[in-house]
UniProtKB/Swiss-Prot annotation:
Gene Ontology, cellular component aspect: DNA-directed RNA polymerase complex
Residues where Zn(2+) 2 binds: C1082, C1273, C1280, C1283
Function: DNA-dependent RNA polymerase catalyzes the transcription of DNA into RNA using the four ribonucleoside triphosphates as substrates.
Family under the similarity heading: Belongs to the RNA polymerase beta' chain family.
Quaternary data: The RNAP catalytic core consists of 2 alpha, 1 beta, 1 beta' and 1 omega subunit. When a sigma factor is associated with the core the holoenzyme is formed, which can initiate transcription.
Official protein name in the record: DNA-directed RNA polymerase subunit beta'
Listed Pfam families: RNA_pol_Rpb1_1, RNA_pol_Rpb1_2, RNA_pol_Rpb1_3, RNA_pol_Rpb1_4, RNA_pol_Rpb1_5
Binding site for Zn(2+) 1: C63, C65, C78, C81
Cofactor(s) of this protein: Mg(2+); Zn(2+)
Intrachain S-S bonds: none
Single GO term (MF): DNA binding
UniProt record, GO biological process: DNA-templated transcription
């Protein structure tokens, strides 16, 4: 039956942002409850995360309640339980959703770097996050306290923060003072002195109370006052010392006014006259003044006018001291009219002399502990505090307390507050102008409250995802685009602001292009993935284990339900706000746990795996499941050697084969029985299971010609999977042919291999004809054999073809045995007349000729298996000779002959290795007698050096270097004499092993039987004490200790290498995977100049190796004749597009001719043919119309035409045949000081003239050879077959469809493990730095590291001569003189050494010093080709140093990917950003398209007239973004003119019902420059998002791709593996899609054979 292999099913994959509608459309129901399953019945809970109604039934075709069972009810929805009857597979596909009670921002868009939402909304990421998470902004601001509220609603003492104050102050009239906040007031208030307390209170300017507590300490001087005295001072009045308190007073005598009786009261000091009873007078009382005598006695009777009191004087009283007047408590006074007092009774007056007084203000609310008049002691408490913590004081109040309590409290003039922030979502235009706020401005909540109060209804602000959503809904993308574009047109493109705008513009354009609404980045509903993808499993002990996702979903549902409940209850805002934040956080951790804040963890502290974790990283969906797919039909087993197999066979254990081929056996059994019923199947299965004999017979039949694939992990290159024909064997191990071990890197010490069975006919055909091991003998990495005999086979062949020590001494005539044919010789051997190594003469046939040769029977036996034209009876065959023999066989006779030769060689080798009886014993290790003498000599020389050092003739470093040198020489000498001693007996087993190349090398023999030599210490520095012993003699303990460093380092190295090498391979594969041969010939004439690769005087690659396997891009011309070169042996002409084999490469590499520098000639202008080389005119030419050519003008057709016009018949010319050739010798000037031409320099006309001036007539040169290379290929995708050249695995031109990128990556990555990690030390000398080698160097180059491990070297940028090298101000400088005499100065960097000498000729790129060259610098100064060649040379060097051979083309593919991008410098009118990267071909195409469309702009304008607009036209007109025309408008001349004037370049119209964009004004093309990318960056820069996402930074790549609505056209290999299609390479290409494959029945096949 004819079947077509495949048709491509999926053409492209698009990723975009899902709208809430789409999320709901995906869903089959809303998940409302966090429950999963009922723990009693184990049934899913209704409306829970495993609900059957939403996700489908748990049992096939059965509803939840069991009412409907069976497939016949499919599609029925059960009315009882609501479950739809369908296959349980639905639970893998059906999704649910959670309706969110509040919108939630998708964390990918919020926290991508740079944040997409932040860029789009033009809000700083920190602020945006704070809005989303209901956060706050830390604000440091002043506060104000109101002192006079005037007519506002404020009260005195209200506090306003600066932000609100500014808002209110603009509109309202009130007075306020700057406020301060009190911090750390000391308490309680303590009296500092003894004294008396007085208390009073007062009000401050903010209307608050201050209580003043005063404590006085004083001394009182008492003054006795007597009645009648007049007191001049008031109570409390301050008086000075000597002030008159009581004035002097004259008192007149007192006479009785009438007759009466006298009563004297001595206590009251009064005198009373009582009248007679008959008199009408009233009694009179007078005070007896101080210092007056009473002249009468108490009770005596007196007559009127009797003198009662004598007169006298009251003396004046002055103040004894300065102080305050204080009235005593018993002092009784009467105020008089003139502000004085009359003393009524005796009492005390005090002058209080104040010693000290202290006042203590305390603020309202503080509690005083004392009362007025209390006496206190120092240290007594007066009040609990004077101020409260965080009390806000006006400046005035602060001043009071600062004066009275210095340093007892601190204040903060600015308050640091975390203020909740909101985003403005709507604002009135006038208010916006007035306040400077706009939609999207972030303000604090208090500011918002102020604005809302002052401008009700004119401003709206929100927080949380709702705010972001509102802001996103407000965005008019078209308008925003026009606005950004007009802003950009006024900025320099490289400015920071412009770059920010460009990033924003890119997002806006991407959203427009993909048709995504910005608000979709905020989730209204969260999709719930199918339950089977997040299963719950019962584990032992009845508990359930669940996927982390269920926990994360549960948190979301719980918080969502709680928020819904709070909203229904109208809970306080602060609670709702907190719940919204928690909901946002729970959705974040569901999508990307740990991206924001601390990751949600389980009870063991392990972070839960969120949806993002399922996608990203090595264990994510991409790398684990999509790219790391498992292969069906496979078994694995240990491998053992199968020495009797053919190279294309493998031994398959019977049991394993039966298991693998079971379906085939079953089918065959059924076919033979001709039945297919269920019972028949059962019976036949039983036959197989019981292993009946007929099952084995059929297995034998089925297996015939059915190849199997064997794979050994790690699969480092394509040779790690090969096809074999299986042979059934007993036992449980797979038998493997010994010769296929090298490609698999397998050995038989317990390695395992996997077996895969190709099932379809197409797969079998591929395995048989492409993957069979006999077709994989040649390595695609270098084109040489890889399936090579090793170890014992080599020893066997070597033993067979080896000769005794005296073979060469035996003369022909002395030889006893002479044979007429090879058969005779072999017969004589088998009969025991001669042994293998006896010299014999035999008649042999070599390439169709018979001749007699002196040989041995062993050599005759070996040559029997070789094809006649390759036989050689005169040499011994070691590893190298065998490799060459295999390679020559392949080149001359093809792969099949090679495979047969290998098989024969294996049989011979094993047989004769056994016959040879190879063993090793200690006796075989022969220690040379000369060893001791060499060591003694070295020790003496070391002693001399030490002596010189002691005398001070040598520095420490010089001594160290000398000693190392001496011991290195001694070690070499010992090695040489050891080798000699061993070679005495050619059949010494160790000598045979080493000499044949089977195992070990002379270095190891030196350590076994010579001396171990010098060792390195852990830092890599050489230890100067050598190990003099060898292992045969045994080491001393000191020597043993010194040896351990290296051993440990080796072990550590190996472990580190493997992982680094694996990662390097992965990056290489990633960067090159999309390079496939897409076409036979791209037609380019570009190419690389073939050169020898030389780095630091080490020939990294010979010219012939550079040429091998290449295609010529130009004819190779003989410098002398100008004709195409022809190979005299093969007759091949080396014209353009000829592919070079080994022989061709060798011939061209050695093609050197001696050419004259210049030749003078007369050119006949009649029979015209221009010379084949560069030539100049030797005379002046003047034409009639004034054209003039001076002597020395280059000859070309213009010159010839004008010479003819000038009437010339002949023209004197000078030809320079050397120009354009490659010099093969160094030529110096006459003095021998200056190099005129260096080796391998391309000679230009200037150089040729310099040679001529210096009298050089002839020079040896080789032709310039240009080969095609992938670096210069112009194929649109991938590369073309001609530029790639030879497929190294079969030496033919590569096939279209070959995945050369992956082969390149494998070829470079596979030997990675062999590369050392070490950074070698150059004998511990400080001046030259460590040389980075091996893997780190390879990585440094591929990753184009900016930071180099070794110091940076410098290179020449000119062609010229080294004029001078000298030290200027402590820095070494190199001066180079160019051809025109200009001098260029180069400063030698520190830690590097000069590599050039005076008089040396340098070319651009010649390194002037040691050290690594910075790739980007090289690229900027010398361009792409020089960089590519440097990279090629340096990467090759890393591998060559380790003895690894890899063809250049593999490196070139990687380098092509590193250099294949351009960076946009100025995007012109394209949608790209400066700094964006794209491939060269894309950039060229875009510019071509722009130029093409610019030509059509005018005709497009005519075409669109009268058509209907599909999208509105928006542009910035005089500072305002205006709509020029709305959607659905007819296009008119006016609209077009206005649009073009405003800078609109294209419009979108309806044309025949479709939306088509037409360009209506010329656009600016973009400018770009080549960029060098490191391989990781190059991988991420790939076009398709699938490939980039599966490489690194998965979430970031997917986020950007979704916003862009990116479409992956599945061009690379990875993308197709991910979607599960055949890869577009090899037989997966469209070209092979229609091949018809027919499966011929076995019987018919057998008939044909017969």
């Amino acid at each position: 039956m004819a079947i077509s292999t495949f048709k491509r099913k999926i053409a492209s994959v698009r990723v975009s942002v899902a709208s809430p509608e789409i999320i709901r459309a995906w869903s089959s129901g809303e998940v409302k409850k966090p429950e999963t399953i009922n723990y009693r019945s184990f049934k899913p809970e209704r409306d829970g995360l495993f609900c059957e109604k939403i996700f489908g039934p748990t049992k096939d075709y059965e509803c939840a309640c069991g009412k409907y069972k069976g497939k016949k009810y499919e599609g029925t929805v059960c009315e009882r339980c609501g479950v739809r009857v369908e296959s349980k597979e639905a639970r893998r596909k059906k999704m649910g959703h959670i309706e969110l009670a509040a919108p939630v921002v998708h964390v990918w868009y919020l926290k991508s770097s740079p944040s997409i939402l932040s860029t789009l909304l033009n809000i700083p990421a920190r602020d945006l996050e704070n809005i989303v998470y209901h956060g706050s902004r830390r604000i440091i601001e002043r506060s104000y306290i109101i002192t006079d509220s005037k007519k506002t609603q404020f009260a005195a003492g209200d506090v306003l923060y600066e932000t609100e104050y500014e808002v209110y102050k603009k509109v309202l009239d009130f007075d306020a003072e700057i406020a301060v906040t009190v911090k750390n007031p000391k308490s309680p208030v303590v009296s500092d002195i003894d004294g008396e307390v007085s208390i009073k209170s007062e009000q401050t300017n903010t209307g608050r109370e201050i209580i003043w507590i005063t404590v006085k300490d004083s001394k009182k001087i008492p003054i006795q006052l007597q009645p009648g005295m007049i007191l001049l001072s008031k109570n409390g009045q301050e008086v000075k010392e000597g002030t008159i308190l009581v004035p002097e007073k004259q008192i007149a005598p007192f006479y009785a006014p009438f007759d009466g009786t006298v009563e004297i009261d001595e206590i009251a000091s009064t005198l009373t006259i009582k009248p007679l009873t008959t008199s009408k007078e009233q009694p009179v009382t007078v005070t007896i003044p101080y210092c007056v005598r009473v002249l009468v006695k108490n009770g005596s009777k007196v007559k009127a006018a009797d003198e009662l009191l004598s007169g006298g004087t009251i003396p004046a009283i002055t103040s004894p001291a300065s102080g305050k007047v204080v009235f005593g408590k018993e002092l009784n006074v009467r105020p008089l009219e003139d502000d004085t007092y009359e003393v009524l009774s005796a009492g005390m007056l005090y002058v209080e002399q104040l010693i000290q007084e202290k006042r203590y203000p305390i603020f309202e609310g503080s509690l005083p502990y004392v009362n007025d008049g209390d006496k206190v002691k120092a240290g007594d408490y007066l009040a609990d505090r004077f101020l409260f913590e965080d009390e806000v004081l006006s400046a005035h109040e602060y001043k009071i307390f600062e004066d009275y309590y210095p340093q007892q409290f601190t204040v903060e003039a600015e308050v640091e507050n975390d203020r909740p922030i909101v985003a403005v979502t709507e604002i009135d235009d006038e208010l916006s102008k007035e306040t400077g706020l706009s939609v999207g401005s972030i303000i604090t909540e208090s500011e918002y409250e102020a604005y809302k109060e002052l401008y009700p209804g004119k401003i709206e602000a929100h927080y949380g995802a709702a705010a972001v959503k509102k802001l996103l809904e407000k965005i008019d993308l078209e308008k925003l685009k026009a606005q950004i574009e007009s802003e950009l047109s006024q900025l320099p493109r490289s400015s920071g602001k412009a770059l920010k705008l460009l990033k924003r513009l890119k997002i806006v354009k991407n959203l427009i292009k993909s048709g995504t609404k910005p608000e979709w980045m905020v989730l209204e509903a969260v999709p719930v993935i199918p339950p089977e993808l997040r299963p719950m499993i019962q584990i032992d002990g009845g508990r359930f284990a669940t996927t982390d996702l269920n926990d994360l979903y549960r948190r979301v549902i719980n918080r969502n339900n709680r928020l819904r409940r709070l909203l229904d209850l109208n809970a306080p805002d602060i609670i709702v706000r907190n719940e919204k934040r928690m909901l946002q956080e729970s959705v974040d951790s569901l999508i990307y746990n740990g991206r924001i804040g601390k990751a949600v963890a389980d009870r063991n502290g392990r972070a839960l795996k969120s949806l993002t974790d399922l996608v990203k990283g090595k264990k994510g969906r991409f790398r684990r499941n999509l790219l790391g797919k498992r292969v069906d039909y496979s078994g694995r087993a240990v491998i053992v050697v199968g020495p009797d197999l053919k190279i294309h066979q493998c031994g398959l254990p019977k049991k394993m084969a039966m298991e693998l081929f079971r379906p085939f056996v079953l089918a065959q059994l059924l076919k033979e029985g001709g039945e297919s019923s269920k019972t028949a199947r059962k019976m036949k299965k039983a036959i197989i299971e019981k292993e009946m004999p007929e099952a084995w017979d059929i297995l034998e039949e089925v297996i015939k010609g059915h190849p199997v694939l064997l794979n050994r992990a790690p699969t480092l290159h394509r040779m790690s999977i090969q096809a074999f024909e299986p042979k059934l064997i007993e036992g449980n191990a797979i038998q493997l042919h010994p010769l296929v071990c090298p490609p698999f890197n397998a050995d038989f010490d317990g390695d395992q291999m996997a077996v895969h069975v190709p099932l379809s006919a197409a797969a079998q055909a591929e395995a048989k004809y492409l993957m069979l091991s006999r077709y994989n003998i040649i390595s695609p990495a270098h084109g040489k054999p890889i399936s090579m005999p090793g170890k014992d086979i080599i020893v066997g062949v070597y033993y067979l073809t080896a000769i005794g020590k005296d073979f060469d001494d035996v003369k022909t005539e002395e030889i006893r045995y002479r044979f007429g044919s090879t058969e005779e010789a072999i017969l004589a051997y088998s009969l025991g007349y001669v042994d293998l190594h006896t010299p014999v003469l035999a008649k042999v046939k070599v390439s169709d000729q018979e001749k007699i040769v002196k040989t041995t029977v062993g050599r005759i036996i070996f040559n029997e298996i070789i094809l006649p034209d390759l036989r050689d009876y005169t040499r011994v065959f070691g590893k190298k000779e065998i490799k060459n023999l295999i390679y020559d066989t392949f080149k001359r006779h093809g792969i099949d002959a090679t495979a047969d030769l290998l098989d024969d060689m294996k049989d011979l080798g094993f047989h004769y290795a056994t016959v040879s009886g190879l063993t090793i014993s200690l006796k075989d290790l022969i220690v040379s007698p000369k060893k001791d003498e060499i060591i003694r000599g070295a020790e003496q020389r070391v002693e001399q050096v030490e002596e010189e050092y002691r005398r001070g003739f040598l520095t420490f470093d010089e001594r160290y270097r000398e000693i190392i040198k001496i011991w290195n020489k001694a070690t070499e000498d010992v090695q040489f004499v050891t080798q000699q001693a061993l070679g005495e007996n050619p059949f010494n087993p160790i000598f045979m092993m080493v000499n044949s190349g089977a195992r070990g090398n002379i270095d190891q023999v030196k350590q076994l039987a010579g001396m171990r030599g010098l060792m390195a210490d852990p830092s890599g520095k050489t230890i100067e004490i050598p190990i003099i012993s060898n292992f045969r003699e045994g080491l001393t303990s000191m020597e043993f200790f010194i040896s351990t460093h290296g051993a440990r380092k080796g072990a550590a190295d190996t472990a580190l290498r493997t992982s680094s090498a694996g990662y390097l391979t992965r990056r290489l594969v990633d960067v090159a995977q999309s390079i496939v041969i897409t076409t036979t010939d791209c037609g380019t004439h570009e190419g690389l100049k073939a050169v020898e690769l030389i780095s630091d005087d080490l020939t990294v690659q010979k010219l012939k190796d550079f040429l091998f396997g290449r295609v010529l891009s130009r004819d190779v011309v003989d410098p002398l004749t100008g004709e195409v070169i022809k190979n005299p042996v093969t007759g091949r002409e080396y014209v353009r597009n000829a592919m070079l084999s080994d022989e061709d490469a060798e011939f061209l590499a050695e093609y050197v001719v001696s050419v004259p520098v210049s030749v003078e000639q007369v050119l006949d202008l009649q029979g015209l043919q221009l010379p084949h080389c560069y030539a100049e005119v030797c005379e002046e030419i003047r034409t009639v119309d004034g054209v003039y050519y001076e002597e020395g003008t280059e000859l070309n057709w213009d010159v010839v035409r004008n010479a003819k016009n000038a009437g010339k018949k002949q023209l004197k010319i000078k030809m320079y045949p050397v120009v354009g050739t490659i010099s093969e010798q160094v030529i110096k000037d006459k003095k021998g000081e200056k190099e005129l031409v260096v080796l391998r320099e391309e000679i230009d006309e200037l150089t040729a003239k310099i040679l001529e001036e210096n009298g050089v007539s002839q020079i040896k040169v080789r032709p310039n050879i240009y080969v095609r290379s992938v670096l210069t290929c112009e194929a649109e995708k991938g590369v073309c077959a001609m530029c790639y050249g030879m497929d190294l695995s079969n030496h033919k031109v590569v096939n279209v469809g070959e995945a050369v990128g992956i082969i390149a990556a494998q070829s470079i990555g596979e030997p990675g493990t062999q590369l050392t990690m070490r950074t070698f030390h150059t004998g511990g000398i400080a001046t030259t730095a460590d040389i980075t080698q091996g893997l780190p160097r390879a990585e440094e180059l591929f990753e184009a590291r900016k930071k180099l491990k070794e110091p940076e070297g410098i290179f020449s940028t000119e062609t010229g001569f080294v004029k001078d090298i000298k030290e200027v101000e402590g820095r070494q400088k190199i001066y180079i003189e160019d051809y025109s005499g200009g001098i260029h100065e180069y400063e030698v960097p520190e830690k590097t050494k000069v590599k050039v000498r005076i008089g040396q000729k340098v070319l651009p790129g010649t390194p002037l010093t040691t050290g690594a060259i910075r790739l980007r610098k090289l690229m900027d100064t010398l361009g792409v080709e020089a960089t590519a060649m440097y990279l090629l040379k340096e990467t090759q060097k890393v591998y060559v140093e380790q003895g690894v051979e890899i063809h250049n083309k593999h490196f070139e593919i990687i380098i092509k990917q590193m250099l294949g991008r351009v960076e946009i410098v100025d995007p012109g009118d394209t949608d790209f950003l400066p700094g964006q990267l794209m491939t060269i071909s894309e950039a060229e195409k875009i510019n071509e398209k722009i130029l093409r469309e610019n030509a059509n702009a005018q005709s497009n304008r005519n075409f669109v007239l009268g058509k209907i607009l599909a999208k509105k036209v928006v542009a910035k007109v005089s500072d305002e973004v205006e709509e020029i025309a709305s959607e659905g408008t007819e296009v008119t001349e006016e609209i077009l003119e206005k649009a073009v004037e405003s800078g609109v370049k294209e419009i979108c119209i309806y044309d025949e019902g479709k939306q088509i964009t037409y360009q209506i004004a010329p656009k600016e093309p973009m400018r770009y420059r080549r960029r060098l990318l490191r391989i990781t960056k190059a991988s991420l820069e790939q076009k398709g998002w699938l490939s980039a996402a599966s490489f690194q930074q998965t979430p970031q790549v997917l986020t950007e791709a979704a916003v862009e609505g990116s479409i992956d056209l599945l061009e690379g290999l990875k993308e197709n593996v991910i979607v599960g299609q055949l890869v577009p390479a090899g037989t997966g290409l469209e070209t092979f899609a229609n091949i018809q494959i027919e499966e011929t029945p076995r019987a018919a096949e057998a008939e044909k054979m017969a």
